[in-house]
Design a protein with these regions (language model features):
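Surface-exposed recognition segments
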Residues: 4-7, 27-28, 45-126
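A short, contiguous structural element within a folded domain that forms the immediate neighborhood
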Residues: 10-42
Length: 126
């Protein structure tokens, strides 16, 4: 499932609908809001760019008691500091855009497929 629709092309930019056509070929991000929003009115929660999360990835990473991404077989929970990435990107597969899918990388890595989301608390609830 993707955020806002089960049809990936309705809500996400990924390799199947971004210029380039094959993973690794030249393509680009898209302006926010060109696809459907999700149920909360948020855009681009799936696809466009991978979003960095604050969670550290470990090979023991589990969701609901079940391992959801086996990861690399590195030794020691914090041998390498890897952060969780979610959402998929314009250069990745439709599977990577699923809400439940996670990826990870070292925290000082950057490329054209990743980004972050700014979040601000409205004055009315402070």
């Amino acid at each position: 499932f993707r955020s806002g629709s089960n049809q990936v092309s309705e809500v996400a930019w990924y390799v199947g609908n971004s210029s380039g056509g094959q993973y690794g070929e030249a393509g680009t991000t898209r302006p926010v809001g060109l696809k459907k929003s999700n149920e909360l009115g948020l855009y681009d929660m799936s696809g466009n760019v991978w979003e960095w999360c604050g969670d550290l990835y470990t090979k023991e990473y589990k969701q609901g008691g079940k391992s959801i991404h086996p990861g690399w077989p590195f030794e020691g929970t914090y041998l390498f500091f890897r952060r969780i990435l979610r959402g998929g990107s314009w250069g990745g597969t439709a599977k990577g855009c699923r809400v439940s899918y996670i990826d990870y990388d070292i925290e000082n890595y950057s490329d054209e497929y990743g980004g972050f989301r700014l979040v601000m608390e409205p004055e009315s609830i402070k």
